[in-house]
A protein has these predicted regions:
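Conserved short acidic donor-positioning loop in nucleotide-sugar-dependent glycosyltransferases
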Residues: 38-39, 68, 77
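Short, acidic/glycine-rich phosphate-metal binding loop used to engage nucleotide
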Residues: 63-70
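Active-site nucleotide-sugar/metal-binding loop of Leloir-type enzymes
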Residues: 54, 72-85
Length: 85
């Protein structure tokens, strides 16, 4: 069983360190990173899908179309992870 880490993202295109997340996944196989795009208006979602291509079994993406705040994004990630358990 993997431990899920929920990472809410809003307009994080320039701040997402793709290499660091992929490296973390390679070194820590017992974790699932669940990125929640919270209605970003930049290319955050594209960056997340690019990351997922490099680690498809260790990264999940939840796309919330309308920005609703961090708490809502975290709840969406928790619901997603719960549905996968």
């Amino acid at each position: 069983m993997k431990t899920g880490i929920i990472i809410p993202c809003y307009n994080e295109e320039k701040r997402l360190n793709t290499e660091a997340f992929v490296k973390f996944n390679k070194e820590n196989r017992d974790y699932l990173l669940c990125f929640v795009n919270d209605g970003s208006k930049d290319k955050t979602l594209e960056v997340l899908y690019s990351m997922k291509e490099q680690a498809p079994n260790a990264i999940s993406i939840v796309d919330v179309k309308k920005n609703s705040g961090k708490a809502t994004a975290v709840r969406a990630g928790a619901r997603f992870l719960y549905s996968k358990s």
